[in-house]
């Protein structure tokens, strides 16, 4: 399965997931697709890595990750959500800087 053929499908999966987050009132501020799908190096078993910046200054990252993982059910289990607070984006630590620099903003 070629990645180029998957780009439209991945976009649809991400949009369906973002709709689900909206239905569950997740306070999404920004979302970036990162990792192999953003870099064009994905293979059929690749995760769909999403950095989800919540409109909150502080979060319990583990709790939010678990919540976001549950919401992927029925859409695509390859979705790998990574929760961040808005302040993580504003502080721009090296991990976040890499996500923003190499990722694709999808929301």
PLM regions with names:
Residues 36:
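P-loop (Walker A) phosphate-binding loop of NTP-binding proteins
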Residues 1-29, 39-44, 55-107:
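Catalytic core of pol beta-like nucleotidyltransferases
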Residues 47:
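Conserved loop-to-beta-strand segment in the C-terminal subdomain of adenylate-forming
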